[in-house]
Curated annotation (Swiss-Prot):
<dbReference type="InterPro" id="IPR029066">
    <property type="entry name" value="PLP-binding_barrel"/>
</dbReference>
<keyword id="KW-0663">Pyridoxal phosphate</keyword>
<dbReference type="InterPro" id="IPR001608">
    <property type="entry name" value="Ala_racemase_N"/>
</dbReference>
<comment type="similarity">
    <text>Belongs to the pyridoxal phosphate-binding protein YggS/PROSC family.</text>
</comment>
<feature type="modified residue" description="N6-(pyridoxal phosphate)lysine">
    <location>
        <position position="25"/>
    </location>
</feature>
<dbReference type="GO" id="GO:0005737">
    <property type="term" value="C:cytoplasm"/>
</dbReference>
<dbReference type="Pfam" id="PF01168">
    <property type="entry name" value="Ala_racemase_N"/>
</dbReference>
<protein>
    <recommendedName>
        <fullName>Pyridoxal phosphate homeostasis protein</fullName>
    </recommendedName>
</protein>
<dbReference type="GO" id="GO:0030170">
    <property type="term" value="F:pyridoxal phosphate binding"/>
</dbReference>
<comment type="function">
    <text>Pyridoxal 5'-phosphate (PLP)-binding protein, which is involved in PLP homeostasis.</text>
</comment>
<dbReference type="InterPro" id="IPR011078">
    <property type="entry name" value="PyrdxlP_homeostasis"/>
</dbReference>
């Protein structure tokens, strides 16, 4: 259940440059409506089959921005482009090219964030720094998928200090890419319920909050 009091406490401390994205996977439409009523306009889902009924039911809320944060499957790419403004989990060149091609067919311009794997983690997908450097020339050629930033998820078990340092590496990487390529990366999607303060301190522009706002997953 959405907690207006927790949301109020969090939003009171957020810098104006940070956007709160409410993660509503497994949550009911009523929870999203409650969060909307409190002022949230950015909502994230990770499974297309779960997201579509919610997006359809809330179609009258025309100022909602839908964010896709789940693992991108090639056969679900079209539905993602059709329904989401932001795609946080662009994690390899092949899926980026496919999203761009579909977006061109649909005359859409979704905002894409490149998922970066800053530390070794076999459970996470994404580019390493070395892989991204190799793929940058091809990413610069994308026309309809607008690469607007980077996203990362940290492995569990890091200290607060190490989390902030690692998040800072994502900001440094974005700065380097902006200097070395034609991309203009302005968004840093980093920080979740357990580590968002460190992400904000390191320069996050989007934080993805679920459990802290809605309680544990069902």
């Amino acid at each position: 259940m959405f907690s207006p009091s927790v949301y109020s406490e969090i939003i009171a401390t957020l810098p104006p440059s940070v956007r709160l994205v409410a993660v509503t996977k497994t949550k009911a439409i009523a929870d999203i409506e409650a969060a909307y009523g409190a002022g949230i306009r950015d909502f994230a889902e990770s499974r297309i089959q779960e997201a579509l009924p919610k997006i359809e039911a809330l179609a009258n809320y025309q100022d909602i921005n839908w964010h896709f944060i789940g693992r991108l499957q090639s056969n679900k790419a079209r539905k993602v482009v059709e329904n989401f403004t932001y795609i946080h989990s662009v994690d390899n060149l092949a899926i980026a090219v496919k999203l761009d091609r579909i977006a061109e067919e649909l005359n859409k311009f979704p905002q894409g964030l490149l998922q970066i794997k800053l530390l070794p983690d076999e459970n996470k997908s994404g580019w390493t720094r070395e892989e991204l450097k190799l793929d940058l020339p091809q990413l610069e050629l994308l026309k309809n998928l607008k690469i607007c930033g980077l996203m990362t998820i940290l492995p569990l078990g890091l200290s607060p200090g190490d989390r902030q340092l690692t998040f800072g590496e994502l900001k440094n990487l974005a700065t380097a890419i902006n200097q070395q390529s034609s991309l203009s990366l302005t968004e840093l999607s980093m920080g979740m319920s357990g580590d968002y303060p460190e992400a904000i301190a390191a320069g996050a522009t989007m934080i993805r909050l679920g459990t802290i706002l809605f309680g544990d997953r069902l």
